């Protein structure tokens, strides 16, 4: 959707160039389209106006490999002058860490990655035990016997392809490769399948998915799940034979996907666990994948 959004952000900037949020959105969208030099110019210009804006420092640091300490020293100065508590420094911690890593200063890089991760953990209210219990429930419920039970499959004009795996394992690259085929389109990362599972389970919960939902879904008609999902994505489809949904968290729901879409495809990306975990540890996912901010989790 970045192709459609970019000219709209350009129009917003042209109409109100003094609004820094419009310019930041234009730069962020441009990164998705490979407009790196344009994005760099925007972030550099914004930081001249707002030198303490941590998120813009973070976005600028991500654009290219640091060749010297110029930007790094600017960020260290911001950190020293603002004197914020750790949970207000998350973006600049990760930005500083990234540039230290670019410069081969490994111990300093790890120090700041840890500061960033610890700061997120201090406010995240996350307990890894809950995720482990959910995964154990899925393994117990979505077993071989259940998967082999006969089902009535829904007929669809377009079949889904789930591209799944931990973040930073190559799901985005895989999505781009597959979607380059003329008979494939991509929806990007959506929550549609999870939403349908929540609805069909009939379980009321504040959790995105719960053990109770998983257990309740075992007796639900896979065809109803397929129908509900296809109704949700219909407005995004354009008469291609296949479409991709690449939300990494869909890996939890592959059993229900396999039963709902016997003709659907699953592409699972696997990467060396150490590489995958450390790559996640270095990334800000906003409030997703809370386990990634602690090496213990």
Predicted regions span which residues?
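Alpha-helical solenoid repeat scaffolds of the TPR/TPR-like class and their adjacent stem/linker regions
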Residues: 1-236
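PAPS-dependent sulfotransferase catalytic domain
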Residues: 33, 187, 192-193, 197-218, ...
């Amino acid at each position: 959707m970045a192709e459609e959004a970019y000219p709209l952000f350009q129009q917003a900037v042209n109409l109100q160039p003094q609004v820094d949020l419009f310019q930041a959105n234009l730069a962020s969208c441009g990164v998705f389209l490979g407009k790196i030099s344009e994005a760099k110019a925007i972030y550099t210009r914004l930081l001249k106006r707002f030198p303490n804006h941590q998120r813009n420092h973070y976005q600028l640091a991500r654009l290219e490999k640091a060749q010297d300490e110029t930007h790094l020293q600017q960020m260290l100065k911001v950190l020293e002058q603002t004197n914020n508590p750790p949970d207000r420094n998350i973006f600049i911690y990760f930005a500083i860490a990234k540039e230290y890593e670019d410069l081969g200063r490994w111990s300093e890089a790890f120090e700041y990655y840890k500061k960033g991760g610890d700061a997120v953990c201090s406010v995240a209210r996350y307990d890894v035990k809950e995720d482990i219990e959910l995964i154990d429930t899925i393994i117990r419920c979505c077993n071989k016997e259940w998967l082999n039970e006969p089902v009535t499959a829904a007929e669809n004009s377009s079949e889904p392809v789930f591209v799944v795996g931990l973040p930073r394992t190559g799901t985005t690259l895989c999505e781009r490769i597959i979607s380059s085929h003329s008979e494939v389109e991509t929806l990007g990362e959506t929550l549609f399948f999870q939403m349908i599972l929540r609805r069909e389970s009939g379980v009321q919960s504040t959790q995105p998915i719960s053990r109770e939902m998983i257990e309740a879904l075992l007796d639900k008609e896979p065809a109803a799940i397929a129908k509900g999902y296809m109704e949700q994505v219909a407005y995004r489809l354009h008469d291609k034979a296949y479409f991709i949904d690449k939300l990494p968290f869909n890996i939890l729901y592959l059993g229900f996907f396999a039963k709902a879409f016997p003709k659907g495809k699953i592409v699972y990306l696997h990467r060396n666990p150490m590489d995958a975990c450390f790559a996640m540890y270095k990334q800000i996912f906003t409030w997703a994948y809370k386990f990634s901010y602690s090496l213990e989790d």
